[in-house]
Amino acid sequence: MFKGLYTVATGMIAQQRKTEIITNNMANANTPGFKADQSTIRSFPDMLLSAVGNTNIPVDKKINAPFIQEIGAVNTGIYLQETLANHAQGSLIETNKTTDIALIDGLFPIDEESGNSGAIFFRLEHPDGGEAYTRNGNFTLDPEGYLVNGNGYYVLSDTGERIIVPNDNFVVSGDGTVSVDDVEVATLGVSFSLNPALLVKQDNGLFQTVDGTNLASAFNQEGVTFGFKQNFLEGSNVDSAKSMTDLLTAYRAFEANQKVLQAYDKSMEKAVNEIGRV
């Protein structure tokens, strides 16, 4: 009975966490460059994997199947294994604002170890040192003329320098070249991650590497193609309809576990009362 309580509890916790992830995605459906989080729920994996290849588990000798093998004891319950960002391209939104710039995904190599496709990001100077990365191209000019993001982080060029322009009358070409009065002043910095699942997602649509090292420039990567579009923003890649469906599914699963928990509670109450009468 207590094992059943544990199973129900883990189910409720996992579904509650999944609900929180989905609602956060929906809340950021209109946030430029936002990458939706995806959760993975696993059940009894540890004991199952440990049993693979274990020849010491007894098998019913009456079964005429020489290659059959039992998996042994199975751990009950589920848990939310991991939460990963979906780095698929969001739709483009025209803003007619010079400082709004969208990154356009092209072709990226596949990481052989993880099977994930690579991803590109704008380079930002983090105030605590190192770099931060974002897909939100909703930039502005600070009082000194530097191109910054909504948090005031400096947008970096491909050479790692801050980008300064005299006013918002500048042009960004399809290859990222920033020009003022037909004079090239910089090239927008873009970094590439072969396995973006290893990046740490921060607040405000920012990403950083786990160890604080800087990602390599996307311009120097073989097989990486991309472009830029000024006066546009990349919208979030949240699928609102799917998110609503997933939210209802998670809620129903939580509700089902809750009813099972109530049934266990009544059974235990009955057992205690009957034992008390003995």
Feature-to-residue mapping (PLM):
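Amphipathic alpha-helical polymerization modules
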Residues: 1-278
